[in-house]
Each structure stands twice: as structure tokens, then as C-alpha cells.
From Swiss-Prot:
Key words, A-Z: GTP-binding, Hydrolase, Lyase, Magnesium, Manganese, Metal-binding, Multifunctional enzyme, Nucleotide-binding, Riboflavin biosynthesis, Zinc
GO terms for biological process, alphabetical: riboflavin biosynthetic process
One Pfam family cited in the UniProt record for this chain: DHBP_synthase
Annotated binding of Mg(2+) 1, by residue: E27
Organism: Thermoanaerobacter sp. (strain X514)
Pathway entry: Cofactor biosynthesis; riboflavin biosynthesis; 2-hydroxy-3-oxobutyl phosphate from D-ribulose 5-phosphate: step 1/1; Cofactor biosynthesis; riboflavin biosynthesis; 5-amino-6-(D-ribitylamino)uracil from GTP: step 1/4
Region GTP cyclohydrolase II, annotated ranges: 200-396
Matching PANTHER family: 3,4-DIHYDROXY-2-BUTANONE 4-PHOSPHATE SYNTHASE, GTP CYCLOHYDROLASE II-RELATED
Gene Ontology cellular component list: cytosol
Name of this chain's protein: Riboflavin biosynthesis protein RibBA
Gene name of this polypeptide: ribBA
Positions of the UniProt region annotated as DHBP synthase: 1-199
Role of this protein: Catalyzes the conversion of D-ribulose 5-phosphate to formate and 3,4-dihydroxy-2-butanone 4-phosphate. Catalyzes the conversion of GTP to 2,5-diamino-6-ribosylamino-4(3H)-pyrimidinone 5'-phosphate (DARP), formate and pyrophosphate.
Length: 396
């Protein structure tokens, strides 16, 4: 359905437009997107005539500050936090509204020789302030446009325009696919762009390393930090991990289960079972800071409250406005690659974890089951994981 990110990047490099689609649970929209430094009056005219949305120019915060172009409002109450700045025109434009004068303004925004006094305000071009870190920080069209320009080796700025149907309603995916076919444009998703960046960029750095004696044996503990977010994770290494395939457990943080001994889940039991087996056989335990299947500790406690009222773990997440599972494993894959591991035997009951690790370039040669005997408090939880989340659990 969607084109390859590599092909889209090549089109951006050549000055072509593409269509970028965001998540159906977000805006569920498609934008025409191209590199700002490649724009012409013809491109702007196409966007106005066929896209029909608002022509905007996503740029970095650094560049906008250099040009003295600041936020449109001090308190941004837009529900998607789209960071509009004051609109601008290039000072030598007449009205600034024609397709060709708008293109001139865009070109001057990315011209290294431009100065703040070269622009009049307000105008007819709407710069947007992209978040540092791009789509890995905010999964919006603003960040996607800047990311694509950078990946194409161009200046970090794009031109975007929403696609609206003939009847005035927003074009959704079926309409966008038809639009792409009609005009011969590539179409990609922001989700695929996120995966591309996660797979091809280094997003963690090794910060510290020390010996860690435990009741399961003597481990080496290695501390990692995510470059974009500062979030911290650790890996416990036992024995020689140069002999592949390596036994691996990727464990997501669970304060209530891992530390407080909660009987509501099987997390603590799984953690200690994994440490014991790795302590005996050698291997790696990656401990990820994504509490509550990614929704955070306080939201997990809210989910517990809903479960006390009869909802299951999936229903509780959805009631709170979250997917059943928000966890991601790209950081774990990068940690394993940093350690030098590529071929693994993964201790998990979660097939999605295997799929994601494989997508990020690891060779998963075996799934090692990690069965925990259910108790009165977590039996419903385990059944829900098995029946609704596809976990390969035999004991319930």
C-alpha cells in the first residue's frame, strides 16, 4: 500500500512532491510534502489547486530563531500542538499571495544569507516550528517534512499542504491512495518513517559499566541513555556473549511486580526466572524503562482501579485512551547491537516482540518460553494477554 521510505527520500532529493499520511488515531490526514529549497511557483500552484489546504513551511527552531520568527501565540492550545509562527512574506514581494511570490518567500526562508529584516509580518507563508528529534519525538507532518529533507541531504525545511477532497472534506487513506495514483506521487506513512529512522540511526549511548553480584550470579551491568529523550535503561550481561545465538530476555519495567511483589501480574516472576536462567546459561537481560506497557506508573495505577471495577487489562487501557500495548523494542535492539549481539534466543511469550526485533535487524533463531504459574489475582490478566494480545501462554 505504502511506498518504501528509501524511494520517497530519493524523490524528495530530486525536488518531487510526495504524500505523507499520519496515524488514523491522530489527524488521519495526508499532506503534500516536498523540500523547501527545491520549491517552485509551479509546486505551490499545484498545492493550492489540488491540495487545497494551508501551505506551511516546517523549519527547525534554530533557523526560525535566527530569522526572528516567533510563535504565533504564547499559549498554544491546539490539541495536536501544531507550532505555528507568525506568518511572513519576503520583503520584495508585492502582495505575497501569488504562487510564485509564496515560493520566493519559501526560498528566502532557507537562504543562508537571509536576515530577519528580509521578511514582513504578517504574510502569506506560515512557518511551523518542528521539534528537535523529528518524528521520533512528535509524529506529525511538521517533523516528517524536516526529517525527509535532512535524510535527502537537503536543508532542514519542507513545504506541506493538507489534501482536501472536491466536496470540501478531508481526504482519508482511500482518497489519498487514489490521489497518489492519479498524479503519480509516492505515498508513505509517518509510522514507516519512524521505523526507518529507528532502524538506521544510533539512538542510544553507553554511559556506564560495572560489576553487579546478585543471588543469580555475577553480572556486568551496563547503563544506556537514549540520545533524544534522556531515558535510561540497563543491560545485565552474564558470561561470554560472543558465542551466538545468545540467550536474551527483554524486560519492561514494572515497579509493582518487580519491586513490590504484586500478584496482579507475572512481571516480577518473569524477571527473576529470566535472571536465574541467564545466571546459569549466560546471556543478556535488557531492562527497559517503559512502565505499565508504556503508559507510565500513574496511568497503570488508574488502569488497576478500572480492573478493580471489572474491566480487563486491555479494556482498562482503552478506557484511558491508550492502545493495549505501547511498548517498543527498537532501543533494546540497539542496545543488543552495541553489545555486539545479532543472533539471539529470546525468552518471551509475546510474538510481537519477536516481530519487532526481527524488523530492527536481529536474527531471532528461537523463542524460549517463560511460563509462570498463575495465581488467584493474575489469572484473568494472563488469560487476557493470551486471548486478546496473542501471548503464547500455556498455563492458563
Amino acid at each position: 500500500m505504502f511506498d518504501r521510505i528509501e524511494d520517497a527520500i530519493e524523490d524528495i532529493k530530486q525536488g518531487k512532491m510526495i504524500i505523507v499520511v499520519d496515524d488514523e488515531n491522530r489527524e488521519n490526514e495526508g499532506d503534500l510534502v516536498m523540500a523547501a529549497e527545491k520549491v517552485t511557483g509551479e509546486h505551490i500552484n499545484f498545492m493550492i489547486k489540488y491540495g487545497r489546504g494551508l501551505v506551511c513551511v516546517p523549519m527547525t527552531e534554530k533557523r526560525l530563531n535566527e530569522l526572528g520568527i516567533y510563535q504565533m501565540v504564547e499559549n498554544n492550545t491546539d490539541h495536536k500542538e501544531t507550532a505555528f509562527t507568525v506568518s511572513v512574506d519576503y520583503k520584495e514581494c508585492t502582495t505575497g499571495i501569488s504562487a510564485f511570490e509564496r515560493a520566493l518567500t519559501v526560498k528566502k526562508l532557507v537562504d543562508d544569507n537571509s536576515k530577519p529584516e528580509d521578511f514582513t509580518k504578517p504574510g502569506h507563508i506560515f512557518p511551523l516550528r518542528a521539534k528537535d528529534g523529528g518524528v521520533l519525538v512528535r509524529a506529525g507532518h511538521t517533523e516528517a517534512a524536516v526529517d525527509l529533507a535532512v535524510l535527502a541531504g537537503l536543508k532542514p525545511a519542507g513545504v506541506i499542504c493538507e489534501i482536501i477532497k472536491d466536496d470540501g472534506n478531508m481526504a482519508r487513506l482511500p482518497d489519498l491512495l487514489e490521489f497518489a495514483k492519479k498524479f503519480g506521487l509516492r505515498i508513505i506513512s509517518i509510522e514507516d518513517l519512524i521505523k526507518y529512522r529507528m532502524k538506521n540511526e544510533i539512538l542510544v549511548r553507553r554511559v556506564a559499566q560495572a560489576k553487579l553480584p546478585t543471588k543469580y550470579g555475577n553480572f556486568e551491568i551496563v547503563g544506556y541513555e537514549e540520545i533524544l529523550t534522556g531515558k535510561q535503561h540497563v543491560a545485565l550481561i552474564k558470561g561470554d556473549v560472543n558465542k551466538e545465538p545468545v540467550l536474551v530476555r527483554i524486560h519492561s519495567e514494572c515497579l509493582t511486580g518487580d519491586i513490590l511483589g504484586s500478584l496482579r501480574c507475572d512481571c516480577g516472576d518473569q524477571l527473576h526466572a529470566a535472571m536465574e536462567r541467564i545466571g546459569q546459561e549466560g546471556g543478556i537481560l535488557v531492562y527497559l524503562r517503559q512502565e505499565g506497557r508504556g503508559i507510565g506508573l500513574l496511568n497503570k495505577i488508574k488502569a488497576y482501579h478500572l480492573q478493580d471495577q471489572g474491566l480487563d487489562t486491555v479494556e482498562a487501557n482503552i478506557k484511558l485512551g491508550f492502545p493495549p500495548d505501547l511498548r517498543e523494542y527498537n532501543i533494546a535492539a540497539q542496545i543488543l547491537k552495541d553489545i555486539g549481539v545479532k543472533k539471539i534466543r529470546i525468552m518471551t511469550n509475546n510474538p510481537q516482540k519477536i516481530t519487532e526485533l526481527s524488523d530492527y535487524g536481529l536474527d531471532v533463531v528461537e523463542r524460549v518460553s517463560i511460563e509462570i504459574c498463575p495465581n488467584h489475582y493474575n489469572e484473568k490478566y494472563l488469560k487476557t494477554k493470551k486471548e486478546k494480545m496473542g501471548h503464547l501462554i500455556l498455563e492458563v
